[in-house]
Amino acid sequence: MEQLWVPSLPILGGRILPMLRHYCGFGSHHPLTWRSLQITGRKQKHNGCWIAYCLPSHNGTSISDTNGVRKDLALPDNLLRDAHILYCTSPAMGHNKEAHPETNKRVPAIVDALEKLELTSKHRGSQVLEIQDFQPASLDDIALVHSRSYITGLEKAMSRASDEGLIFIEGTGPTYATQTTFQECLLSAGAGITLVDSVVAASKLGPKPPLGFALVRPPGHHAVPEGPMGFCVFGNIAVAARYAQNQHGLKRVMIIDFDVHHGNGTCDAFYEDPDIFFLSTHQLGSYPGTGKIHQVGQGNGEGTTLNLPLPGGSGDYAMRCAFDEVIAPAAQRFKPDIILVSAGYDAHALDPLAGLQFTTGTFYMLAARIREVAAELCGGRCVFFLEGGYNLESLSSSVADTFRAFLGEPSLAARFDDPAMLYEEPTRKIREAIDKAKHLHSL
């Protein structure tokens, strides 16, 4: 199978959108949406559910960006006021490779768990809203973070992927593409943008806006400005951060990344930016080998990158200490206008790709504490973005418990976590790492 380095490719000239419209049987006047491009996946379930449709022609709540452009959200004010959770799903069913850990089964597994644990609108009414038919991100949105040469190169690569079935787009790395990858990645980025729009609109209606969760794939936090990396194609959270700044005037954005791997792409995008605070906890020495504790940003951005690499075996104790002593104080000092979260669930003890030992309860704690910090500092404006998590059981139970934290309900971690799978955490090394981060950042 031929390997392809995408950023070196020439411009395609927009062939992918007509091709996909033809493939889906839509005329060029139809908006491209998640459902119109879904190749296979879960069936639509109404059953009395609240389902919010985000189409420009639909009448509903609207917001104005910093350029005065109005955007219809199709979310009546009463729904925004009542909602505790807004979420979008973009499972990217066509973006798949057999035996690859980043599989198209990930998002459906989460959705199934939410349904079984009665955390969907079918069971919760307007407390939990799934926004469907959201629009893909525009190429200009993606270009807020990624180079034009990469974007157009990837678009061109779709014709090769159509011929070959699957291509590799990261040189010798693990990131692949199929013929639907480009458009599905635009949809995943669009999910995050839609949730930012909706959470911001809700925050203008009352003091307790819903939290957002973009249940999307492929993940994004490894994608660098010039290309793909580590299963990631576009930096979903980075695009949303720039969008929040440019379209909503939310100047100060805090990004918390608790994936087991360092979010090097997000870090690179904002390493010199004083208005975006990037904070990553990750396993020391894990892929991609970046995120050293002394890397704190540079130029005007010095001090707005905080890396906290944790020793292998770190778990609930480590993250509780990290949150109390590093994450919360850093947020309180930075005073963000919105908090975005790279929610990777591959730090779970059952995950096959790394060596931390978080539990379902750890992720519940993180979600609950981040919710509290967002309420205290930025009017509750907070959106989570799915990153890693490759054991479908631990991934789905942990995301479900995240939803319970958003709702302010007790954790069900005891149903999923087996204490026998855990071993003693390296407390001395954990303390050394936390103390060093506190010293470097004067916390």
Swiss-Prot record:
One MF annotation (Gene Ontology) recorded for this entry: deacetylase activity
Residues marked Polarizes the scissile carbonyl of the substrate (site): 390
Chain spans, region Histone deacetylase: 82-412
Enzyme nomenclature, EC number: 3.5.1.-
Gene3D superfamilies recorded: Histone deacetylase domain
Cofactor(s) named in the record: Zn(2+)
Protein name (record): Histone deacetylase 10, chloroplastic
